[in-house]
Every structure is written in structure tokens, then in C-alpha cells.
Regions:
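Active-site-adjacent beta-strand/loop module that shapes the phosphate/pyrophosphate-binding cleft
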Residues: 23-29, 99, 111-130, 142
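Acidic, metal-coordinating catalytic segment for phosphate/diphosphate chemistry
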Residues: 5, 9-46, 51
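Nudix hydrolase/Nudix homology domain
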Residues: 1-5, 9-10, 17, 32, ...
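Short, solvent-exposed loop/turn elements at beta->coil junctions and helix N-caps
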Residues: 10-12, 105-110
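Beta-rich strand-turn-strand
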Residues: 81-86, 94-100
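A short coil-to-beta-strand element that immediately follows conserved catalytic motifs
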Residues: 6, 98-104
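Conserved Nudix-box catalytic region and its N-terminal flanking loop in Nudix hydrolases
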Residues: 2, 41, 45-89, 134-139
Length: 144
């Protein structure tokens, strides 16, 4: 059975700096119509850095959760940006580490409602060169 849905009408409900929210009318494989709400996002890149069996994590406040959470270093891609370049930039800005990066996976974190893809890299041959946080970015680094 063909599982593809055919887009009939597409409408952008909101367009912001980081995301846009869309509402599409689609034709389902059985010929019936349905609506799909989804978020468009440029994607992200993240880096897994392991030193002596400990993973480097960043801890920062995330407004959507209203609490501090641990994450691997990551950031959003600029439009048409090479994910490896974004990963290297984010690793150095957030943690102060520079490394050789090896792509290990690309994942679809929430495919039910966004087109975001996150590219994950493994840091090898890393060295500390100094943290350079973006304006308005506040975080702490921890090996756990």
C-alpha cells in the first residue's frame, strides 16, 4: 500500500526567527482528506564528547520546560549550513573545546509534528581552547 499523503493546500500560520508553523490539507492514501499541523525548523547539530568515560554535558535553563536541563552541546543550523561546521562552532562556543568531528547519526527527534533533523557527531582528538558563549547564552559545562 502506498503510504504517501498528497498536499492539497498549505498555509503558514506563523513565521518566526527559529520556526514556522504550518497547516496543510492533505489527501490520505484512502482518498479522504485530513489536516496536518507541523513546525518547520532548519535543523540542528550536536556533539558527543567523551573523556575518560565521562560525557561532556551543558546545563542550561530552558524556558519551554521552565527548568535547568542537561544536554549534549548543540545548536541550530543556519540556512543551508553544513551540519559539521555548525557542530564545530557550537562545541567551541558552548564548551570551549575544539575537536575533529565524525558523523555518527542523523535523527528525526519528533517526526509527528516537525521536519527538524539533528545531526550527531563524535568529538575526537579534542583540546580546550576557551569558551565563547553567544550574547544572552548562559550555561555550565559538566563531565558526567
Amino acid at each position: 500500500m502506498n503510504l504517501k499523503e498528497k498536499k492539497l493546500i498549505s498555509k503558514t500560520l506563523y513565521s518566526g526567527k527559529i520556526i514556522s508553523l504550518n497547516l496543510d490539507e492533505v489527501e490520505l492514501p484512502n482518498g479522504k482528506k485530513a489536516y496536518r499541523e507541523y513546525v518547520r525548523h532548519s535543523g540542528g547539530a550536536s556533539v558527543l564528547l567523551v573523556d575518560n568515560g565521562k560525557i561532556l554535558l551543558v546545563k542550561q535553563f530552558r524556558y519551554a520546560y521552565n527548568k535547568e536541563i542537561y544536554e549534549i552541546p548543540a545548536g541550530k543550523l543556519n540556512v543551508n549550513e553544513d551540519p559539521k561546521i555548525a557542530a564545530a562552532r557550537e562545541l567551541e562556543e558552548e564548551t570551549g573545546y575544539r575537536a575533529e568531528l565524525v558523523h555518527i547519526a542523523s535523527i528525526y527527534p519528533t517526526p509527528g509534528y516537525t521536519d527538524e533533523i539533528i545531526h550527531i557527531y563524535l568529538a575526537e582528538k579534542f583540546e580546550f581552547v576557551g569558551q565563547r558563549l553567544d550574547e544572552g547564552e548562559f550555561l555550565n559545562c559538566h563531565f558526567i
